[in-house]
């Protein structure tokens, strides 16, 4: 498994206003985001956290352009956890509809989860088909189900509010996406140094962001984060529609995904 120190650029953390435990990297130095000669300092608006920087990532990691209101496409190692805002109700329905109304494709995100950890009861259980649409969220602001995507004992503890949780295992092809409420999750662990290292492992986006995953590939993880930042529209709807995503496939050996195409403008 790749260690955090080997991939210092495998994260972007967007500021969550008013969240005391959020990781704020809006002022990160350009050399923290890749080679200094090819990267600009990451910028994020304080209110809406729209990233507008061009970033060159570490060796072996594909570069990605980050532009306001465009898709944010990153090639990331399969040790990444995604922490996002509420993806429930109408917003969650809009996320699923973003797969060009192909419901069989969209539910595959949840259907491939093998096990979830029932944090309240301290036991593992199967991921039922009636709950697969809830795989993307922990928005109840209390101890709830969590999924372990880290596969590293040094990073298998998160603190959900006041409840320290040991996260349970999932299937090998399920580790490309996890969305939880950003206000409920803070870094935790047996030693303080893990809290600093955890920042290399978590992608934090503010409430209202949309998180999608594309076609699975055997060697890399790529996530698509689509900003829900449209004037005159709600968080769960707009006149912008995504292009068709490639059909998903699963590899039993790795956690992976490729990027979807950008949103039509």
Curated annotation (Swiss-Prot):
Entry keyword set: Plasmid
Location of region: Disordered: 233-265
UniProt feature, compositional bias: Low complexity: 247-265
Name this polypeptide is given: Uncharacterized 28.3 kDa protein in PAR locus
Lineage of the species this protein comes from: Bacteria, Pseudomonadati, Pseudomonadota, Gammaproteobacteria, Enterobacterales
